Amino acid sequence: MPLSTQSSDSLSSAGRQSFGVNSVSDFLAQFPIPTNLPSNKWQDIPVTFLHDNEIALIDPETSMEEASSILIDRDLSALPIVAAKGSNEIATTFDYADLNSFLLMVVGFDDFNDGRFKKVAEDIRAGKVITAYEVAKLGKNKDDFITIPHTTSLGRLAEILSSGIRRVAVTNEQGELSFMASQRSIIRFLWNNIRAFPDLEPLMSRTIHSLDIGSTDITCISGDQKVAAALRQMNQTGIGSLAVVDAQFRLLGNISLVDVKYVTRSSSVYLLNKSCAHFLSVIKSEQGIRAGKDSAPAFNIYESSTFAFTLAKLVATQCHRLWLVQSPSCPPSPKNNAHLSPGSMGGVKVNQLLGVVSLTDIISVLYAHMKGTLPPAPHSAPSLRHGRRGSTSSHRSHSKASVDTQRR
């Protein structure tokens, strides 16, 4: 059984928020050592070992309806759009941020000041067929479309992704696009094969506190706010997910751009006017139906959570960030509660939101560990760093990627 499946079941069945430093080795020892890899150094493994699904290309004439169906039904994170039918040149990509932007234009829940958006909105109201390309080329904060050859090592890929780039395209021997390699896919591969890489095992017992990663530059929304407000906030800020909190700043759940798929059907548009707290229950129900059980991922970790537990949770939840919340056993560092409102300072509550840890943070740690520049465990309180790219932060002090790969 894959480590991710086993660890996911273990996390949910035990109901634990972390496994301690002393139990990490015992936990990892349950699983066999993979024997099908060409090296015991993860950074030397070819990127082709991340290949788990084919790339899906669309052309400039593909309608929004068709592109959205491909994106959702195939469970993809993005669709490259070729410059013209039959071309290998990539013009841009279509993703959930574009789908969210389109939905807001359709229902009129955003005030688009940009004249280009107004033109598309007018075409929508006139009943014209809108293409995915028309919407995608209006997208905000898009990564450059980067391609790397199939011979690229995971170490080089980690260098690229630690800069905050979320995904790259991998080409085959003929130079044709083969598949997408993402931050999430490299983390999933390393976690599933962790026993094959003994150099990583000492890192697994380090805590979020000792690694000093994360950011207090968090974006959240109240549970009583409407879903439309959450989608609008993500569209305007360019971030990929929001923490949903109650009046005491306690974490209720997470709404991400991917969750826009639950409101794209005409029968579910009414959810846009429901509260975010209600929407969380809808998401839980939908995910439970797909998983065949009444369960939903928990997107929170503690400062005391180990790196191993954090990886396991990222793989199990398939999310792009985890919310750092107050542990029931440890008080937060003064710096971590500086953003809390004066009314909430009478006593920091369990599950109170403190910060966010992103995939970029995690890959930055892996890259720094590979380079030998990861600082040793500190003895002082952690200081969460203010992030970049929305709520994402990274160790710029020990992760300075020079991205010079081919950009299309």
Curated annotation (Swiss-Prot):
<feature type="domain" description="CBS 2">
    <location>
        <begin position="140"/>
        <end position="197"/>
    </location>
</feature>
<feature type="modified residue" description="Phosphoserine">
    <location>
        <position position="329"/>
    </location>
</feature>
<feature type="domain" description="CBS 1">
    <location>
        <begin position="51"/>
        <end position="112"/>
    </location>
</feature>
<keyword id="KW-0597">Phosphoprotein</keyword>
<dbReference type="InterPro" id="IPR046342">
    <property type="entry name" value="CBS_dom_sf"/>
</dbReference>
<feature type="domain" description="CBS 3">
    <location>
        <begin position="214"/>
        <end position="271"/>
    </location>
</feature>
<feature type="modified residue" description="Phosphoserine">
    <location>
        <position position="77"/>
    </location>
</feature>
<keyword id="KW-0129">CBS domain</keyword>
<feature type="modified residue" description="Phosphoserine">
    <location>
        <position position="341"/>
    </location>
</feature>
<dbReference type="InterPro" id="IPR050511">
    <property type="entry name" value="AMPK_gamma/SDS23_families"/>
</dbReference>
<dbReference type="GO" id="GO:0045842">
    <property type="term" value="P:positive regulation of mitotic metaphase/anaphase transition"/>
</dbReference>
<dbReference type="GO" id="GO:0042149">
    <property type="term" value="P:cellular response to glucose starvation"/>
</dbReference>
<dbReference type="InterPro" id="IPR016711">
    <property type="entry name" value="Ssd23"/>
</dbReference>
<comment type="function">
    <text>Required for normal DNA replication and for proper mitosis. Induces sexual development and ascus formation.</text>
</comment>
<dbReference type="GO" id="GO:1902472">
    <property type="term" value="P:regulation of mitotic cytokinesis, division site positioning"/>
</dbReference>
<feature type="region of interest" description="Disordered">
    <location>
        <begin position="376"/>
        <end position="408"/>
    </location>
</feature>
<keyword id="KW-0963">Cytoplasm</keyword>
<feature type="modified residue" description="Phosphoserine; by CDC2">
    <location>
        <position position="333"/>
    </location>
</feature>
<comment type="similarity">
    <text>Belongs to the SDS23 family.</text>
</comment>
<dbReference type="InterPro" id="IPR000644">
    <property type="entry name" value="CBS_dom"/>
</dbReference>
<dbReference type="GO" id="GO:0005634">
    <property type="term" value="C:nucleus"/>
</dbReference>
<keyword id="KW-0539">Nucleus</keyword>
<dbReference type="GO" id="GO:0031139">
    <property type="term" value="P:positive regulation of conjugation with cellular fusion"/>
</dbReference>
<dbReference type="Pfam" id="PF00571">
    <property type="entry name" value="CBS"/>
</dbReference>
<feature type="compositionally biased region" description="Basic residues">
    <location>
        <begin position="385"/>
        <end position="399"/>
    </location>
</feature>
<feature type="domain" description="CBS 4">
    <location>
        <begin position="297"/>
        <end position="362"/>
    </location>
</feature>
<dbReference type="GO" id="GO:0004865">
    <property type="term" value="F:protein serine/threonine phosphatase inhibitor activity"/>
</dbReference>
<dbReference type="GO" id="GO:2001211">
    <property type="term" value="P:negative regulation of isopentenyl diphosphate biosynthetic process, mevalonate pathway"/>
</dbReference>
<keyword id="KW-0677">Repeat</keyword>
<dbReference type="GO" id="GO:0051286">
    <property type="term" value="C:cell tip"/>
</dbReference>
<dbReference type="GO" id="GO:0023052">
    <property type="term" value="P:signaling"/>
</dbReference>
<dbReference type="GO" id="GO:0005829">
    <property type="term" value="C:cytosol"/>
</dbReference>
<protein>
    <recommendedName>
        <fullName>Protein sds23/moc1</fullName>
    </recommendedName>
</protein>
<dbReference type="GO" id="GO:1900735">
    <property type="term" value="P:positive regulation of flocculation"/>
</dbReference>
